Every structure is written in structure tokens, then in C-alpha cells.
Amino acid sequence: MANVAVVGAQWGDEGKGKVVDWLSERADVVVRFQGGHNAGHTLVINGVTYKLSLLPSGVVRGKLSIIGNGVVIDPWALLAEIERIRAQGVEITPEVLKIAENACLILPLHAHLDKAREEASGTAKIGTTGRGIGPAYEDRVGRRAIRVCDLADEAVLKAKIATLLRHHNALLRGLGAAEVDGAELLAKLLDVAPKILPFADVVWQHLDEVRHTRKRVLFEGAQGAMLDVDHGTYPYVTSSNTVSGNAGTGSGVGPGQVGYVLGICKAYTTRVGEGPFPTELFDEIGKSIGERGHEFGTVTGRPRRCGWFDAVMVRQAVKVGGITGIALTKLDVLDGFKELKICTGYKLDGKVINHFPASMTGQANVEPIYEVIEGWSQSTRGVRSWKDLPATAIKYIRRIEELIEAPVALLSTSPEREDSILVHDPFAT
């Protein structure tokens, strides 16, 4: 039986929450495999809005939901999110939610360092959410992170805190920021430990059992391919691998278990924060797209930058992310425009190129080459059948498929989960 990995194919905020919820109804297990509470999913179910950051979308439907070892976890943020979702009537128990015991923690000192660095960077800032994601991943690869399993051993916590503070307090001193008190940090961790540890488990074993019983697993990615620490617009990226190759590594299964890779992208392009954005619109059209699409970050509330669909970027995401098919979202936002534009290539130093360059200079200087497509006046909002789409909307979709070299498997026409057109069932592969 096929598994499915859902990943972003742009700069995040593509509408993964709705698609994951739509698929999770038919999945047996939902797994988060990377990122932290810097990314958010908004789910709308029966008129009720749920905003999730760390919790896998499956919890809302009572499905076994796993936070994998590739996720960095702020335990206080996680507990606050659990209580908020419980207050909406959702039952969250250790039978429903399991956290990888080898997942690394985000501590208050990580957010402290994150903000101190951004302030010191001035105009060269990356535009992080300031929630400590990057510093937590640094500690993971630096082999000094505190992991979920460490919460059960006070002696280990004391030793690891001492190691952490030798590193972090030196950095903080250099930035002119206040140092961290070890005793205070230990007290906070000992207080939160009994609230987190009941959810801790050997999740790779559970996933292996699921594999042998041929149950369906949905791997839920955060952010998007162009925020990948290797393949994105470095250094304006997140601190983890967001592409599907990390679904296995970040959850404890082999790469062959990932299955169908569904890339999510909007019918236009958005980005939050700093970094290059070749098709960004600074005119009334860009403003209109932002207003129609309600383009504000789920977690940060920051307005998103808006622009035309960039087929070069999405095609690159398809290639490096192993994307099998695309879920195209927010088509309805483009209703009423007389003409639309699709970026089909870039000009750089007088030459035409068909990829997004790796260098910062190249990324900043590429000029989009546009193809103009006729728009449509008929509303597509809430359409649930391909035959009810305007002919020009279908033409727009088909052109996108040609340019990105991947088929549209799913089309979303509103935030409501049922307002979708299934072209190809990812679980049927």
C-alpha cells in the first residue's frame, strides 16, 4: 500500500495544511519529519479553524501522529499548542501523539541567541522567526543538543547544560547579550519533563510495525523546497532539509518507504521575510493578490510578498525534491485578472538560464522572462469538478504542467477541504 510525502514546492505557505488534512482522513499515520514551530498549518474543518505549528495535522482527526527525530521541539510551545487544540475539543493522548525520543529540543537560550544575532546583523539579517530553530539545529550537528530522552535523567541534563553554556554564553558575550543561568535552565527542564516524557517513544519501531501491516503513512513536510538548507535560496533559508529525501531520515524509515511525493504550490508565488524573489510584484496587482489570498503568515502574522508563478523555481523543486505530482492551490485567487504571467526562464548577465542560480549575486540579479496567459472572469472558488472550470483556467493549469514537468494531481479552489478536484490519487500509486 502506497505512502505519501507532502512537501512544499515554493517558499512555504503553499497550502500544505489543507492538503495534508484532506489526505490524512485516508491515512493511518501522519508524521512530521523536519522543522520546528517556525512553520504553521491552518486547517478549516466544518467551519472550525485549527492552527498548528508542531503537531502533525492528523491529531485533529484522531490519527496516530508522530513527531519525528528530524523535528526540533520547543517543549513549552508544544504543550501550549496541545492545550490550545484540546480546548477546541480535540483529544490528544500518548496513544494519539508520539514524539521521537531522539528528537532535539529548542531551549530558551536558542531563541535568545537567534534574536541577538538578527539584531547584530542589521541590514544583513536573514529574517528568521526568532524562535531558535537555527541555533537548535546547530547544536544538533555540533553534538551538544539536549534530546527528548535526556529529560528523564537529571545528571545527564546537568552535564549537557554545562557543555551548552560554555558554547552559548561565549557567543552571547560576543554579541553583547545577557548570558544564560544554568540553574534556571535546569529547573525549567525538570519542570517540563514529566509533561513531555509520556509522549516520548521509539517511533521508528512503530513505523516499522506500520510498514509490516501495510498501513498508509503520510509524511508531512514544513516550509518549502526553496527554503531547503542545501537547495534553497541560501542563506535565506531554514536550517533543515525540506525536500522529500529527508522524510526517511527525519522519521526513521528507509527512503523506499516514502512513496509518492506530492509537491504543493500556489497558482502564484509568495514569500515571507528576506531573500531573493524574481517574480515579486510591487504594484496594485501584487497588493490585490495578497488581499484576495489573505497572505499573512500563520505563525508570525507577517504579510507575505506576492508575485507571478515562477515555473523555473517550481521545476527545480520538482527535480531536487523527487516530486511525483503537484497539488495546485489558491487557483480562485486569480479569478478576474484579464491576463496572467508565468516566469519561464531568467536572464542573467545577458544570458538566458533555465535554473535558479546558487550564488547570492546570481539570485539577486536574475530577471524573469514572462509568458502572458489569458485570464478568466468566471469564479473558480469552490469548484469541485474539472468540467466546471473555465477553459482558460484549464489552459493555465496545463501550461504550468508543461513548464514544471510534473502533472497536477490535485487542485484546490478554496480553504475548505472538500473544495478540491482530485486528478490522480497519490495513495493509489
Swiss-Prot record:
Keywords: Cytoplasm, GTP-binding, Ligase, Magnesium, Metal-binding, Nucleotide-binding, Purine biosynthesis. Pathway: Purine metabolism; AMP biosynthesis via de novo pathway; AMP from IMP: step 1/2. IMP binds at residues 13-16, 38-41, 129, 143, 223, 238, 302. Mg(2+) binds at residues 13, 40. One of its GO terms (molecular function) is magnesium ion binding. Substrate binds at residues 298-304. It comes from Paramagnetospirillum magneticum (strain ATCC 700264 / AMB-1) (Magnetospirillum magneticum). HAMAP family: Adenylosucc_synth. Homodimer. NCBIfam families: PRK01117.1, purA. Its EC number is 6.3.4.4. PROSITE patterns: ADENYLOSUCCIN_SYN_1. Binds 1 Mg(2+) ion per subunit. This is Adenylosuccinate synthetase. One of its GO terms (biological process) is IMP metabolic process. It comes from the Bacteria. The lineage of its organism: Bacteria, Pseudomonadati, Pseudomonadota, Alphaproteobacteria, Rhodospirillales. Pfam families: Adenylsucc_synt. It catalyses: IMP + L-aspartate + GTP = N(6)-(1,2-dicarboxyethyl)-AMP + GDP + phosphate + 2 H(+). GO terms for cellular component: cytoplasm. Belongs to the adenylosuccinate synthetase family. Transmembrane segments: none annotated. Its cofactor is Mg(2+). It is found in: Cytoplasm. GTP binds at residues 12-18, 40-42, 304, 330-332, 412-414.
